Amino acid sequence: MSNQQALREPPQTATQSADASSDAGSLPLLNLASGREAVLEYFENTWALTEQLFSSLASDEAYYVRPYHKTRHPLVFYYAHPVCFYVNKMLVSGLIDKPVNQEFELLFETGVDEMNWDDLHEGGQDVWPALDQVRQYRDAVYELVRQVIRTHPSLEKPITMASPAWSLAMGFEHERIHLETSSVLIRELPLEYVKEPDVWPDWLTAPAAQNYEPVEGAHYPTNELLEVAPTRVSLGKPHGWPTFGWDNEYGQDQREVNSFQASKFLISNGEYFRFVKAGGYEQRRYWSESGWGWRQFRNVKWPTFWVQDGPAGSHRYKLRTTFSEIPMQWSWPAVVNY
């Protein structure tokens, strides 16, 4: 099976193994004027990416483990939620006329308020169905969406906002948004619940040796501020543009932007390490009001995915990636907003 075939013909449940020789990869944003076959290919690619991501869960139990911060549902919700979204949006648009599983389409419809970092969800953890039931539901919706794409008259011409098939495009992009949601939740799980997917690319090229004292210019790039000249920027997406867009992307606006400075590189782990080691997390002046509230609430002193690898105060860290724990990669961009 070729790499493209592996993405076009995904395993329908995470219990079915994908081709170990294939690499996970995303197709470009779908051109909605490109016809049924392109729409089907994009859907199957989207589905495959979700299956590949969830194949990293090492056991059924991992689907039901609550995140340590308790501000999100367990991963079983995010495995079913995008699927439920397809059904509900197709019902609203008229692509289908009856639910697949009305109980699931209520249970998995709504997530949590991602803006409330202190909104703990303490109850209701016994409401989630068995994983086999969720997999059967996913299988049924997968076949339904394929059938709609192959047969519905609205896909005989380019998909626009006025087309019932716009709901399909919305479903594709909604599912892709949740790849980030789920990947972060997987990254937050204890390692015992996670494994690297067989189809994951061999991307790690950094030295295996641990280095606790990074040197600027050797272990991470020397950064500098670059001058950006004043300019006029145009914002907004034309309504006739042949790709899906969310409502806030449309309209037209122009703004005059004054000159400013921007760093040449993203802030690396090595550069951020200096901030951490200097006690930046304990200094109120560096934080917004809500950011400081979060820092105090969590009592954090370094980024979430930096793993302490020594006694308190030693500033010895490893790096937690999505599926494993590795030596700190000082040249990689710092991830600090979780």
What does each model-found stretch correspond to?
Residues 110-156, 166-170:
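Acidic/histidine-rich alpha-helical segments that form the ligand environment
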Residues 179, 201-234:
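Contiguous, non-catalytic segments that form substrate-binding/exosite surfaces or channel walls
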Residues 2-13, 61-116, 155-212, 254-255, ...:
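Short, contiguous alpha-helical
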Residues 130-142, 246-279, 309-338:
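Short aromatic-cysteine micro-motif
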Residues 39-42, 46-53, 82-85, 130, ...:
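Alpha-helical packing segments of well-folded alpha/beta enzyme cores
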Residues 100-119, 222-231, 288-324:
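Core domains of carbohydrate- and sulfate-ester-processing enzymes
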Residues 2-71, 149:
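N-terminal regions that are enriched for targeting/export leaders
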Residues 250, 269, 277-300:
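Surface-exposed recognition segments
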